[in-house]
Amino acid sequence: MTPLIFVTGGVVSSLGKGIAAASLAAILEARGLKVTMMKLDPYINVDPGTMSPFQHGEVYVTDDGAETDLDLGHYERFVRTRLSRKNSVTTGRIYENVIRKERRGDYLGATVQVIPHITDEIRRCIDEATEGYDVALVEIGGTVGDIESLPFLEAIRQVRTERGPEKALFMHLTLVPYIGAAGELKTKPTQHSVKELRSIGIQPDVLLCRSEQAVPDSERRKIAQFTNVSERAVISVPDVDVLYRIPSGLHAQGLDEIVVNQLKLADKAGPVDLSMWEDAVDATLHPLDEVTIAVVGKYVDHQDAYKSVGEALKHGGLRQRTKVNLKWLEAQDLEGTDMAALADVDGILVPGGFGDRGFEGKVLTSKFAREQQVPYFGICYGMQAAVVDYARNVVGLEGANSTENDRQSPNPVIGLITEWRTATGDVEKRDDKSDLGGTMRLGLQEQRLKPGTLARELYGKDVVAERHRHRYEFNNRYRTQLEDAGLVIAGKSMDDTLVEVVELPRDAHPWFLACQAHPEFLSTPRDGHPLFIGFIRAARERKAGGKLLSEARA
């Protein structure tokens, strides 16, 4: 059975459990271990798919079409394992599974209770997601003391009791606040957090102490004494200027060695090679160029809603030793303005979204980029905005719109996808009365690129696969009309029914590309993504006055 590392959090939320867990996973992977990760979320939603971006942040989509927590994005950016629906489990899904089993009669008339039925289902999901790996990290969402988290904590307590410390390790992330008036770090919140954890039967093996500054040895000794944790296993995790420093910082304190020794992984784990992360830090701290990218979205007040977009832009810069400054703009605020907010940027990206609020601002942004020759990258809703702009202002289709925003549009150039074929060959059908949750075109889908296009040049191959999350598409009734007016259909689904990529000819615009998929979900600091790398290079060329630049790899 796969050794497990359970990651819990205490004191307050948003301390960075996902980043800390992913950083440890990256170190273990760098030692040659086959690693996977999993998130257990205590909210009752079945998945985050219908949750507000202002509350929950980004919905991250996996290859198999699962709508998951944004922490899975951190996981996939830090480790090479491609995750799936199995790696994201919520209370809602657990209860849904248990109730379905009860209705089928699987429990043979027993009274269904949290213990053992809910906890058994949690354990089954953990086993299913982690089977076949050298080691797995399982993050429990929320903080210790939350009533919603109790079934998950009880389930992992049972796992540890059954498997023993050599097959299950508890790692607890906690806050050590710095009190400026007193000029010192306070360990009491950590002591109480561990006390709460121990009261439900869980004794941490490792403590990760989050703080503004490094926790001194004297405080680490004090924490160890009051929490019954070995001093060497009290790890300081201070704020860092570059995210990619964290794996090296944890390794320097011996965290991976503690894990490898306790879980008896020494025979599989080799010497660590963190050169990739060190190179990423060096490229971030010593850039050779700098650009400013405007991100024109609907949820910019909560930037976690575009977490993967922001990271992918930085990855695109990283591959060229270029610092990418992000200028977040609310699409709605641009409506009725002279677009002066976009005057000083080197490139414009319009990300995904839903609903009519701010859509006209996105259309105006596309128009500005097209007319002012500013590099433009549209993603999902950003592609639809570009198509609407082109239909209205180039082709002259009065009232052109998406039926998502105007069902009575005389020229619905964007419409609801009523039927499409999935990656497995199944035919999916939807209408405007279908449930919102889980009814979109989701997951990894292949597309064929048109020879001679910018998209084909950037990808370097004819067929590519990207992750999708949308229910509206380019209306094929207008395909010929828009192509005749100069819009290039650069990519289509393998059955030729769905438009995947549009662009402008390079003799008409230096870099204007929009795609229906979400390429940000496949970008990593290791490799970047061809579209984001190309977009940042185009922004650099605009800043350099149109001078063609070669890629300076990190």
Swiss-Prot record:
Higher taxonomy: Bacteria, Pseudomonadati, Pseudomonadota, Gammaproteobacteria, Lysobacterales
Domain Glutamine amidotransferase type-1: start-end pairs: 292-545
Source organism per UniProt: Stenotrophomonas maltophilia (strain K279a)
Note: CTPSs have evolved a hybrid strategy for distinguishing between UTP and CTP. The overlapping regions of the product feedback inhibitory and substrate sites recognize a common feature in both compounds, the triphosphate moiety. To differentiate isosteric substrate and product pyrimidine rings, an additional pocket far from the expected kinase/ligase catalytic site, specifically recognizes the cytosine and ribose portions of the product inhibitor.
One GO term (biological process): 'de novo' CTP biosynthetic process
Residues annotated for Mg(2+) binding in this entry: D71, E139
Protein name as annotated: CTP synthase
Molecular functions per Gene Ontology: ATP binding; CTP synthase activity; glutaminase activity; identical protein binding; metal ion binding
Binding sites annotated in the UniProt record for UTP: S13, K186, T187, K188, P189, T190, Q191, K222
Binding site for ATP: S14, L15, G16, K17, G18, I19
Pfam family, one: CTP_synth_N
HAMAP family associated with the record: PyrG
EC number: 6.3.4.2
Region annotation (Amidoligase domain) ranges: 1-265
Entry binding sites for L-glutamine: G353, Y381, G382, M383, Q384, E404, R471
SUPFAM superfamilies linked: Class I glutamine amidotransferase-like, P-loop containing nucleoside triphosphate hydrolases
